[in-house]
Amino acid sequence: MKAILLVLLCAFAATNADTLCIGYHANNSTDTVDTVLEKNVTVTHSVNLLEDRHNGKLCKLGGIAPLHLGKCNIAGWLLGNPECELLLTVSSWSYIVETSNSDNGTCYPGDFINYEELREQLSSVSSFERFEIFPKTSSWPNHETNRGVTAACPYAGANSFYRNLIWLVKKESSYPKLSKSYVNNKGKEVLVLWGIHHPPTSTDQQSLYQNADAYVFVGSSKYNRKFKPEIAARPKVRGQAGRMNYYWTLIEPGDTITFEATGNLVVPRYAFAMNRGSGSGIIISDAPVHDCNTKCQTPKGAINTSLPFQNIHPVTIGECPKYVKSTKLRMATGLRNIPSIQSRGLFGAIAGFIEGGWTGMIDGWYGYHHQNGQGSGYAADQKSTQNAIDGITNKVNSVIEKMNMQFTAVGKEFNNLEKRIENLNKKVDDGFLDVWTYNAELLVLLENERTLDFHDSNVKNLYEKVRSQLRNNAKEIGNGCFEFYHKCDDTCMESVKNGTYDYPKYSEESKLNREEIDGVKLESTRVYQILAIYSTVASSLVLLVSLGAISFWMCSNGSLQCRICI
């Protein structure tokens, strides 16, 4: 009876002891992140670094509308294709849009020389001044300026020609040598375009230019070239057996360009004084134009985001996130989200010694749960929580700032004869994308690992802070909790939390209670030992008596014969 009472007293004392536990926050978040060692780790808080949404619209960029070429392309717009006449008055834009069916380009068949390079030059131009470089009415008095029209470039049902060029032909029966120069006094680069006509027969050559052995020379300080017409029969394209090649050059401020010819020259009428600006570009898109504004435009739609990465489209214009191939880039800011299992108690393992988080603690990441004679409750440790928030916020901002390199990434243009270069370029671009994607994913994996380890370390530090104060005034239960050897009211609990716990004040009471509990345990252990001895002896006696009774019964009924020899 004494042993039973001692055991009950010990259990009752343990049940009513004041306790203080260290724990961490948990919530109903389903956010998951990946680390170097784990995938799909559920965390309490995280931030997304990857933008995957767009509005499906072509918007103004920085308040400036794009130039939508409609059914025209760059060549048709700059040459002045009659089908592109509505574009002639446009002088500024944020970016240029071609569509998948922008077919109105060079109406008279021929090659546009270095067309891809011209597109590249225009990708950095945000406006230009279209001006008459050689006035039609006064520049060519000895040549015909109105007969140079063709059925290949119709307008309103009649033969016509490019609005920015003049097709000079002989006047009456003469095509005298022409020489005309322009000095660039615009203070900026001037884009000049011209053409060279190649008739199909010598008869056409004489009919148009009179001179059988004609030539064209175009020269500036950086451009010098002499052209000879290539007279040859060719298959008809758009009803034309002849061909017309188109050329361009940029004239620097103060430089002079000179045209000299005895035939076959398509002279410039209008030129373009260009204003270069960052953020412009050319995209191919069938998305509709809307009255909206954005800082980043892709062919699929506008992106309004401050995130450092996007997986929408590799071609971007404006202040845009870096394109990566990733489908998920989420950075942990909070802790592992492991709500405690109620059937196993309130506490339990982060950092190896706490099994689950507390959904009841909502005002911090780390904190305490106490239980004493005055009740129980949660309290966050504001200092460690705030330090952690500041540190992680600074880290996230630093990562975003370093990776958030806003820039324009326009597509590159190659002609049909440059497929090898185009394929090589695609491989190089894909290689860069793979490297960027790998770097972004590795960065997030490493930072997530560090963040979760950082939280574990903070919980451990909080635990050690309490343990170093309590010393032997309390015992460690082993699940993140301490059981006091003395009464600890709310004031006492608060002193432990804020680091002002008075160890000497409670040490005497703790010593007495500790010795009493240890004595009870020792006495109960001795009683258990005595009971074990008594039980063993009693069991042995019962076994011997049973064996004797069985032997006597078997001897009496003859089943067992006993002989005693003297």
UniProtKB/Swiss-Prot annotation:
Residues in the signal sequence: 1-17
Name of the molecule in the record: Hemagglutinin
Positions on the Extracellular side per record topology: 18-529
Organism per entry: Influenza A virus (strain A/Swine/Wisconsin/1/1961 H1N1)
Annotated lipid attachment (S-palmitoyl cysteine): C555, C562, C565
Disulfide pairings: C21-C481, C59-C292, C72-C84, C107-C153, C296-C320, C488-C492
SUPFAM superfamilies tied to this protein: Influenza hemagglutinin (stalk) (SSF58064), Viral protein domain (SSF49818)
Main location: virion
Domain of life (superkingdom): Viruses
Post-translational modification: Palmitoylated.
GO cellular component assignments: host cell plasma membrane; membrane; viral envelope; virion membrane
Gene: HA
Site, Cleavage: residue positions: R344, G345
Keywords assigned by UniProt, alphabetized: Clathrin- and caveolin-independent endocytosis of virus by host, Clathrin-mediated endocytosis of virus by host, Disulfide bond, Fusion of virus membrane with host endosomal membrane, Fusion of virus membrane with host membrane, Glycoprotein, Hemagglutinin, Host cell membrane, Host membrane, Host-virus interaction, Lipoprotein, Membrane, Palmitate, Signal, Transmembrane, Transmembrane helix, Viral attachment to host cell, Viral envelope protein, Viral penetration into host cytoplasm, Virion, Virus endocytosis by host, Virus entry into host cell
Protein's cellular compartments: Virion membrane; Host apical cell membrane
UniProt family annotation: Belongs to the influenza viruses hemagglutinin family.
Function: Binds to sialic acid-containing receptors on the cell surface, bringing about the attachment of the virus particle to the cell. This attachment induces virion internalization either through clathrin-dependent endocytosis or through clathrin- and caveolin-independent pathway. Plays a major role in the determination of host range restriction and virulence. Class I viral fusion protein. Responsible for penetration of the virus into the cell cytoplasm by mediating the fusion of the membrane of the endocytosed virus particle with the endosomal membrane.
Residue positions the entry lists as glycosylated: N27, N28, N40, N104, N304, N498
Miscellaneous comment in the UniProt entry for this protein: Major glycoprotein, comprises over 80% of the envelope proteins present in virus particle. The extent of infection into host organism is determined by HA. Influenza viruses bud from the apical surface of polarized epithelial cells (e.g. bronchial epithelial cells) into lumen of lungs and are therefore usually pneumotropic. The reason is that HA is cleaved by tryptase clara which is restricted to lungs. However, HAs of H5 and H7 pantropic avian viruses subtypes can be cleaved by furin and subtilisin-type enzymes, allowing the virus to grow in other organs than lungs.
Record GO biological process: clathrin-dependent endocytosis of virus by host cell; fusion of virus membrane with host endosome membrane; fusion of virus membrane with host plasma membrane; viral budding from plasma membrane; virion attachment to host cell
GO MF annotations in UniProt: host cell surface receptor binding
Entry membrane topology: Single-pass type I membrane protein
